[in-house]
Amino acid sequence: MKSLTFKGGIHPPERKEISENQSIENVFPSTKIVSIPVTQGGAPNQPIVKIGDSVSRGQKIAESDAFMSAPVHSSIAGTVKKIEMRPVTGNIDVLCIVIEDDGSDRTDFMEPLNPDTCTKDEALARVKDAG
């Protein structure tokens, strides 16, 4: 079957002389250390872990009792190294939890909730807890 193409278009010169013989390099920083802002919209959260704590992927690490807030969970398993102010998008300093990956894949996800047996309050609490 003949492939469909468009007539015309823009065909700028490639100009890849500088890079055509270079190998591809990973320029992104290692994910062995992550910095997770404790507030990601809504009311500010407070850390519920401390420096030196071991955390699992999916574990809640910050929360707030305020109406408009969502808890924050760890994206990696590892050890909490720092809890400090760090710049985020817009060069605004926010409280962050710094976690060093320990190489394990420990998880701490919630067990599924049975919709046939849970109450409305249990379901709402679970949704809020999940962030």
What kind of feature is each model-predicted range?
Residues M1-G131:
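Well-ordered secondary-structure scaffolds
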